[in-house]
Amino acid sequence: MADDQERDLQRFLENVDEITSLIQEMNSDDPFIQQKAVLDSEKKLLLMEREQEEDGCRTTLNKTMISPPQTPENADEMSPDAFLASVEKDAKERAKRRRENRVLADALKEKGNEAFVRGDYETAIFFYSEGLGKLKDMKVLYTNRAQAFIKLGDYQKALVDCDWALKCDENCTKAYFHMGKAHVALKNYSKAKECYQKIEEINPKLKAQVKEHLNQVTLREKADLQEKEAQESLDSGKNTAVTTKNLLETLSKPGQTPLFYAGGIEILTEMMADCTERTLFRTYGGFSTISDHEVIRRCLFLTGKDAVEEVLCVSVLKLWQEVCVDNEENQRLLVTHPDMARLLPSFMTSRILVIQQQSLDLLLQLTQTENGRNQVIKHLDMTQLCEALLSFLAFSDKKANTAIGILTDLALEERFQVWFQTNLPDVLPALTGALNREPKITSPSALCQCIALLGNISAEPTARKHMIAHEEFGNACLDLLVKCEEDMDLFREITYTLLGLIMNLCLEITFLSEMWVVKMSRKCLSLLNSKDGGILTRAAGVLSRTLSSSQTIVEEALTAGVVKKMIKFLRMGGQTASRYAIKILAICTNSCHAAREEVVRLDKKFDLLMLLLASEDEILAGNAALCLGNCMEVPSAAPSLLKTDIVRVLLKLAGSDSKETGVQLNAGIALGKLCTAEPRFAAQLRELHGIQVLNSTMKHLNDS
């Protein structure tokens, strides 16, 4: 009892010290210290309640008084119990108010968000501020308000709000993000980089986004230096710099003829010899002078252009190329101009060849860097752009290669891949049109590159399903394969690449129409007569994925001598070809006795299959076990293996910890068929304790 009283006393004294400290913090002038004290007091209250519940399990001192308590001599004095009760009551009231304020703050935040979306940033700031009046430690209100301040150009206030958000949560990545943007706007580039680097430290998963923002900071810093040097050249009276400025002023004059502007733009283009003039073009509003000029703009958007309007358009395209040379900030400004999203794709599909060529040259220049490619993907109409690039397959010259090369480079960017997965159904008609091109009048290398791009895209399951769902796409693949077979020497690369795409499509065999599968299988059976090793391998690859869907095709394949050809594949070696060959043999022997007999005849002592069973490639070994098990149904097959260690080999596979459960299952089935066909193998199995191994394997397979 005395020990319990002593512990209670010590606990009480500790509580008094802690509560006194909390009260002092609650009275602090710093609102964050106040809020922290409130939270700590709530935690303390919960802890005390938990301790009281635990204390209820042990004997406590009976505090019942015989006589009523005496009035304290000093009214200001408070008993310890009353003091704790007061703190408890205050904490509960504060917790209740905090919950109520949280609801109000959330409602005000939503109103602020709605105003922000409308572009009414002042109103958004008002609601965020009102919310902070209800709850001062709500970090999202600080970061949202900082974002609104950035939109209004009030970067210092944005930085202050970001600081407050970090006081609420030192790992608030959103605060560092907005702080970085504010520092960039204030030209504090080193501080901006520190902010973005801090984001990656906190969350390494954001590495890609951080890299992009750091790149933007570097480019902005480089652009500032260019502008400073360009202004110094202008101030020093450099002739070309002054001429550039004067020409821009002349071109901004309204009401002149298109030919006047075309001539001025051509002279201006000649001035764009180095970085100084290109930068001055930017700083003195060159992009808006050209793109927003009433006469020039009208000519750019006209569908049917006369000779003068054509000259003006070409001169503008050449100017844009020159001002973008080695100047990524100019490239950014050009690509982000609102008109460019639809203007550049429309130029590329123009009936005027010179405009087509110049616009293609411009796009090529814009996509030379990673940043340029991402700017194009982010800001241009990618559906129209893809269609425009694919339309260049109509040309047999280098324009087709350039266009598909650009598309391929864009497709390597993660941003493009994300866009493509979402928008593939919209682009599929154009991609199907590319496959429908007549290979004899299309650039073979460009068409091949286009098909390779489709093959890469089809490696992703969702993309494959979209392609298969678009029936015309599969038919276009089949038709193109037929066209290429007419001149295999000329179209060898196209055929080889196309078979790779078809192999990917056949991974979704259940979604393909039976008629298409039959036609494609027949075409690949004929390709097995090719002398080209690459085409042979891929044709076998397609068949390894289609044969199992149709007994008719299996029978046609046997008639075409597929077993003999696959045995030849296996004798030649090569992991990829062997994988396809043994799978085809497994499919054929699984459904056709004639195939089993032919395998037994061509591989009399099963030397090939034994070799594959010993392979470290689990897929090879598993299909070899399946094929061997099928062949055990041929009467003379099992005895031919008596002088081999086939039981030990199969038992090892059946008891292995293979990731491919089919390996264990196929080996177990093969053992069963082997022992059934030849009882002497059953004796070997018992000697090797194989029954226990098989039982254990079957139990494991059933459990998994």
From Swiss-Prot:
Its main location: cytoplasm. One of its GO terms (cellular component) is cytosol. It is found in: Cytoplasm. The modification Phosphothreonine is found at T71. InterPro entries: ARM-like, ARM-type_fold, TPR-like_helical_dom_sf, TPR_2, TPR_rpt, TTC12. GO terms for biological process: axonemal dynein complex assembly; sperm axoneme assembly. The keyword Phosphoprotein applies. Keywords: Cilium biogenesis/degradation, Cytoplasm, Phosphoprotein, Repeat, TPR repeat. The keyword Heme does not apply. SUPFAM superfamilies: ARM repeat (SSF48371), TPR-like (SSF48452). Gene3D superfamilies: Leucine-rich Repeat Variant, Tetratricopeptide repeat domain. Cytoplasmic protein that plays a role in the proper assembly of dynein arm complexes in motile cilia in both respiratory cells and sperm flagella. PANTHER family: TETRATRICOPEPTIDE REPEAT PROTEIN 12 (PTHR46540:SF1). This is Tetratricopeptide repeat protein 12. It comes from Mus musculus.
